[in-house]
Amino acid sequence: MDLSKKSAENVAYMVEKIKEKLKVLNFDAIKPSHFSEEWYDELKDIYEMVMRKNTFSPSEMQAIAEELGNLRKK
């Protein structure tokens, strides 16, 4: 997947991979449709950070959830 190109498909891919890696239980809380390509670079930064780590502390999980919440479409 070429994540250097901003597209709705790439947004959906990154959101799904973040959910898988973080083992999100409430899948409806994070949907690709909640995110705009306007925030693509920020979402990609979160995606890359999540993919680099193997485990997350509760405070890291909270921080990631807050950042994703800040990027959601209003």
Swiss-Prot record:
Source organism superkingdom: Bacteria
Species: Geobacillus sp. (strain WCH70)
Cited HAMAP family: UPF0435
Identification of the protein by name: UPF0435 protein GWCH70_0415
Family: Belongs to the UPF0435 family.
Pfam family, one: DUF1128
